[in-house]
């Protein structure tokens, strides 16, 4: 795992098309903004896991 330190307003790049910007820090919460092309799905981990679980439960044709 790559660990980076960023301050509010600073950005990191993921590949050529995705940026992640630290918008704010309040207590133990960090607000981030993600800019990505429409074809790149961006989800919170718990939402992504729910989507995957629902896909696994779909009957196959």
Swiss-Prot record:
Name the cystine pairs. none
**Any one Gene Ontology cellular component term annotated for this protein:** cytosol
Q: Which GO terms describe its molecular function?
A: mRNA 5'-UTR binding
Q: Which SUPFAM superfamilies match?
A: CsrA-like
Q: What is this protein called?
A: Translational regulator CsrA
Which Pfam families does the UniProt record give? CsrA
The UniProt entry lists the main location of this chain as: cytoplasm
Taxonomy, top ranks, is: Bacteria, Pseudomonadati, Pseudomonadota, Gammaproteobacteria, Pseudomonadales
> Known Gene3D superfamilies for this protein?
Translational regulator CsrA (2.60.40.4380)
- Keyword check for Methyltransferase: no
Species whose genome carries this gene: Stutzerimonas stutzeri (strain A1501)
Looking up InterPro entries in the UniProt record yields: CsrA, CsrA_sf
Keywords attached to this entry: Activator, Cytoplasm, Repressor, RNA-binding, Translation regulation
Superkingdom: Bacteria
Q: Where in the cell is it found?
A: Cytoplasm
Per its database record, what is this protein's job?
A: A key translational regulator that binds mRNA to regulate translation initiation and/or mRNA stability. Mediates global changes in gene expression, shifting from rapid growth to stress survival by linking envelope stress, the stringent response and the catabolite repression systems. Usually binds in the 5'-UTR; binding at or near the Shine-Dalgarno sequence prevents ribosome-binding, repressing translation, binding elsewhere in the 5'-UTR can activate translation and/or stabilize the mRNA. Its function is antagonized by small RNA(s).
Q: Which PANTHER family match?
A: CARBON STORAGE REGULATOR (PTHR34984:SF1)
GO biological-process terms attached to the record = mRNA catabolic process; negative regulation of translational initiation; positive regulation of translational initiation; regulation of carbohydrate metabolic process
| Complex formation | Homodimer; the beta-strands of each monomer intercalate to form a hydrophobic core, while the alpha-helices form wings that extend away from the core.
So what family is this one in? Answer: Belongs to the CsrA/RsmA family.
């Amino acid at each position: 795992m790559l660990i980076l330190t960023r301050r509010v307003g600073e950005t990191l790049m993921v590949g050529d098309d995705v940026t992640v910007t630290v918008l704010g820090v309040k207590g133990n919460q960090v607000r981030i903004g993600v800019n990505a092309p429409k074809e790149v799905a961006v989800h919170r981990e718990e939402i992504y896991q729910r989507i995957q679980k629902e896909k696994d439960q779909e009957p196959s044709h």
